[in-house]
Amino acid sequence: MWDLEYCKDLDLQHNLDVMHIEKNICDSIVGTLLNIEGKRKDILKSRIDLTHLGIRKDLQVQDEGKPRDMAPAVYVLDKVKRKEFCKVLSRVRFPHGFASNPERRVSADGNKVQGLKTHDCHVLLQRVLPIILRGLGRPKLYRAVAELGQFFKELYSRNIRIDALERLRDKIPTILCDLEKIYPPAFFDVMVHLAVHLPDEALLRGPVQYGWMYPIERRLGTFKGYVRNRARPEGSIAEAYIAT
């Protein structure tokens, strides 16, 4: 990309997808909170990292430690709290067309949340997750996640002022610092740090509705529904598109 002649003249050199950044951050928070295999960030290696870095002594584990030696953390719920979290989530009801039914995302054993789509994470992070965390008695975590959800909520505004974007640009580093006081370093992958650049991109591009992937994903979903011969998906899509 950097070899292209016009690249140096572009003001907006990257068009970061707000939709997937928000989803990945939400997946990391929920996966760690409910201790979901494959999505959690609180694993044995992350605790050993704390020992090597000499920080967060209350959560440190020695090199020869085992997962059962990991001390309880505020960002991970125990089994009783996980069931309570899923129970509350399954009882949430939204106006028709606002969001999908959260009950469908709760596993049969009522112990974890699975199959979250991008819009599910959008609603969960901005509106539902802070309320549940406050009810579960996690005030420090609640404040940090609520600030993060409010950041995305303001960023998603249809009409947004330049001074509001400048305020969000100054606010997001503080929000991430608050999260760093709670979560281990392993939580902060590239997707979490990309949130810092979103207000700057909105200042250059305009409202995020002109740069997110929702319409593209919906259109791709329509095309996938055209597939009848999975051995030749492109031909199936082309024939169905011409027929319509």
Task: Locate predicted features.
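A structural signal for the principal folded core domain
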Residues: M1-T244
